[in-house]
A protein has these predicted regions:
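Soluble, acidic/polar mature domains that operate outside membranes
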Residues: 1-326
Length: 326
């Protein structure tokens, strides 16, 4: 019995030692991976700040200067406050700058062109009241890293080129897709619209017994769309739902008054459809038109012109006959 106990004790000790060795190996591997990652990104601090302290990013890319202001996590374009920004793209810039390290520090060589005479990208970041300006030149032909200089520092540095990719956007590239209509398809209670032909169509949602159910309880009811004042004509509910989804859909671009939004140039002198959408919050007018460069939307109370896909226009310009069930 004693021999058996000693054997078990030895096995337990061996297992404990192996477990400790495995833990140490995993920890060492994690440390090596972290060190390798840090080495790849660089270890020479160029720009460092808490993301909570950031207030402004100004960058010039290919000659266009954009100034992004951060107010309590909401981004605004200083040059055009009406413009809807891609919040994710702005936050990616913050992440790239908040811990930007250089991989190498070099001495500039006479006669060498580092791309600073006409830099593709210049970034100025303001955080905690401190301003840092970085000028990015050309890429090293061997390593692919980009040359960078920091204002107030005569040294030349290189950074991983991937850290600057998030700034390769002009104004249009920073647009954040959203729904300017401001409602969901499920919120809509009534739709009334006039087509370019002059045809007027009015739709209203009602609650009806689902299928052949004859139980008068809420579980057997469903929302059914019909022509206003016409309870007998069946509509193609899928086409109606496509229309509701189109009315509440995201837009793909924006032309603000600051950009010279011109309704006439975008076809709003002869709109394809003028749609009044009623929800619990009230009635809003959406106008759709077609210009030489595509299809557009304007929303009541908003002076911007929004680019929409052609399929959206098709869905919201259906005639009464097209909506009637076969």
């Amino acid at each position: 019995m004693n021999a058996k106990r000693r054997t078990l004790a030895v096995l337990a000790a061996v297992i404990a030692v192996l477990g400790l060795a495995l833990w140490a190996l995993n920890r060492r591997t994690a440390a090596e991976e972290a060190a390798s990652s840090a080495a790849a990104d660089g270890t020479i601090p160029l720009c460092s700040f808490s993301t909570a302290d950031l207030s402004r990013i100004t960058y010039t890319y290919n000659g266009q200067t954009l100034t992004l202001d951060d107010a309590d996590g909401s981004w605004t374009l200083a040059e055009d406050s009406d413009y809807h920004l891609d919040e994710s793209a702005c936050n990616t810039m913050v992440t790239a700058l908040s811990s930007l390290n250089a991989k190498r520090q070099l001495d500039a060589q006479a006669g060498e062109d580092y791309g600073f005479d006409a830099p593709e990208l210049t970034v100025t970041v303001t955080a905690a009241g401190q301003t840092t300006t970085l000028t990015f030149g050309s890429s090293n032909t061997v390593t692919g890293d980009r040359y960078v200089q920091k204002d107030g520092d005569t040294a030349l540095y290189t950074v991983d080129a991937s850290r600057t990719a998030c700034f390769a956007y002009d104004k249009a590239g920073l647009f954040g897709s959203f729904s300017p209509a401001g409602f969901a398809a499920s919120d809509v209670e009534q739709v009334a619209y006039t087509l370019a032909s002059g045809e007027k169509v009015s739709l209203t949602a009602g609650s009806e017994l689902a299928g052949d159910g004859d139980e008068a309880d809420s579980a057997s009811y469903e929302t059914v769309w019909r022509f206003a004042g016409d309870a007998d004509t069946d509509l193609d509910q899928d086409k109606v739902q496509s229309m509701l989804s189109a009315l509440s859909s995201y837009v793909s671009g924006q032309i603000t008054p600051a950009d010279g939004a011109d309704p006439a140039a975008c076809g709003f002198d002869a709109p394809l459809a003028v749609v009044q959408v009623t929800t619990a919050d009230g009635t809003k007018t959406l106008t759709y038109a077609s210009g030489t460069d595509g299809d557009y939307l304007m929303v009541e109370g908003d002076d911007s012109i929004y680019a929409v896909d052609g399929s959206i226009v098709q869905a919201v310009t259906q005639t009464a006959d097209a909506l009637t069930a076969a």
